[in-house]
Amino acid sequence: MRSNQAIPPTLVPKLLHRFSSSEGYEAQRDLVPAIRALRERISQQEVERLVIGVITNSDDRVPEVLSSFGLNVSPLRYGIPFEAIALQEKQYDIDFHCMSYDVGVEKPDRRIFNAADIMLSHIIKARYHETVSESDLESWQKVYVGDEVAKDVVGAAEAGWNPVLLDVEGKSTEIASLEDIPQQTLEDLFEDHASVRVGSIRNLVTWLTGWNWETR
């Protein structure tokens, strides 16, 4: 635009829509079916429980963006009151959001991961009717998947989470590749490796579940 040219009245609404929806972003291939495949496999194991959340250095557009990709997104956000019955009556692809916009700090600050711990305790109480202590939360295998070493891998590790680097281009060769590691329990995996990397969400879910994508 020229310096003296007026801003078109439709420009701002169009930009707001673009960056509040899938129009302005690109999702990992098979993101939605991968998350649902993970939930399906875990639901078949009566002892296991699965909570999926988002921890992000972003604002309150995130739930809307994820919804526009076809994910079924929970209304649960850090710092926002919620109705427990909403978690009891419906199954979501994404159970909660911890956004720096709400928490007040950004990754790698451990407080944003601590906020996710609080969200986890709320979900356990609402969904499973159990009150959890800090020691109870320690018994959960908390895995964080992100694409930046400094913010995601280091931040998660320092907060007591198990980090998985989403390394699409395969550049972080100093970190063990999950695709090269035989399937085992998460506990054994992170006893042997401080962190691991994976080329895609699809490969991560395949490693975790043994999911056969060719039959889907």
Language model: regions and residue ranges:
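Surface-exposed cleft-lining segments at the edges of enzyme active sites
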Residues: 13-25
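Fungal eukaryote-biased detector of long internal structured cores
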Residues: 23-26, 33-44, 49
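Asp-based, Mg2+/Mn2+-dependent phosphohydrolase catalytic module
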Residues: 32, 36, 41, 53-216
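A metal-dependent, Asp-based hydrolase signature
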Residues: 1-16
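Acidic-and-aromatic substrate-binding clefts and catalytic sites of carbohydrate-active enzymes
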Residues: 23-27, 104-107
